[in-house]
Amino acid sequence: GRTAHYIPELAKVNPNLFGISICDTNGNLFSIGDHNKPIAVESISKLFSLAFAIKKYGIKTVHNKIGMHGSFLPFNSILAAKLSPSLTINPFLNQGAMATTSLLYQKNLRKYKESLIKNMSNYASSSLRVGRMVYASESKTNDVNMSLAYLLKSADRFYAPVEPSVDAYTYQCSTMVTSDNLARMASVFANGGINPTNQKSLLSKKQTAYILNNLLPEGLYEYSDDWIARTGGRAYAKSGVGGGILIVIPGI
């Protein structure tokens, strides 16, 4: 692979960085390589905004407003949205992810954005921060996302003002994480919604199962089918163009 050149700041990332971290359901962390080097979380954040929305509104409401339709098209495809009866498709493609973030809208933009980072920090058992240079870079190159959001808004499938919501979505994607952070974040889902690092309950088992069942066919976009075939559907993965992959193996 190669770095994401359509976001200038991500194009500067060292492509030779490589780290692996594993956090088991007892909270034990094992790491090798560049496990303390921060990268932008990018689309992995979609998993956590979905969890946040489900925690706040419940499965039924989020399912009805966001949808869970599969797609063979790229994650930011306007055509994919147009071809879907509900337009949003699912929360793991950009249009559905931004619609999910719009459900979490607050009039105070600073508090709105900070709530998204705080939510991810709860899963990481660590105070995460936003990469300001990444955020600035992405904010200058998010025209497609803005177009998708306005398309959804025109069909009443976007639930807050477009510009602050897309800004908040860009902000959450610019959060910096290490592989250690990602491992601890994944461990919450592996442990049925309980953070094994501090024993805090973040999701119910039912909510966790719903999220994972819908992550499986879309977490790696058009490569998800190949992933399922290779893993037997036992590992749930979410990728991000920042270079990270989060993998959940329930019970381990």
Predicted features by range, described:
Residues 47, 53, 176-195, 244, ...:
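Active-site-proximal alpha-helical segments within enzyme catalytic domains
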Residues 10-13, 89-90, 140, 234-238, ...:
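Short Gly/Pro-enriched turn/cap motifs at secondary-structure boundaries
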Residues 27, 40-63, 185:
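Active-site SXXK
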Residues 190-252:
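Structured C-terminal helix/loop/strand segments within mature extracytoplasmic catalytic/sensor domains
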Residues 1-32, 246-247:
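A short, well-structured edge-of-sheet supersecondary motif
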